[in-house]
């Protein structure tokens, strides 16, 4: 069974990059996205269930890995996409 704690543990290395922060609010866990250039929160996502949190973080993780592969300077290659897909699969397996 997937729990919030398991999701947090799986994504801890990604979260330690400092772009995303998870806070517990009176309405549930919330994912905040920080823009270092503008020095402000640019995205807020409430996660009602551990599955919601896992899905949202997996999407952010995938986008981040795609960005890291190119640094926004070129299109993703098939090799880039394959490597990101492998990293995504590893995260999915850890969530099981």
Stretch-by-stretch model annotation:
Residues 1-19, 61-78, 91-96:
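Negatively charged, low-complexity tracts enriched in Asp/Glu with abundant Ser/Thr
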Residues 23-81, 85:
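Acidic, low-complexity, intrinsically disordered interaction modules
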């Amino acid at each position: 069974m997937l729990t919030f704690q398991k999701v947090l543990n799986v994504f801890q290395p990604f979260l330690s990059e400092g772009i995303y922060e998870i806070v517990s609010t009176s309405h549930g866990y919330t994912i905040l996205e920080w823009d270092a250039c503008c020095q402000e929160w640019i995205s807020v996502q409430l996660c009602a269930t551990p599955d919601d949190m896992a899905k949202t973080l997996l999407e952010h993780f995938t986008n981040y890995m795609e960005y890291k592969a190119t640094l926004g300077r070129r299109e993703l290659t098939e090799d880039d996409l394959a490597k990101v897909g492998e990293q995504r699969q590893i995260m999915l397996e850890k969530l099981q």
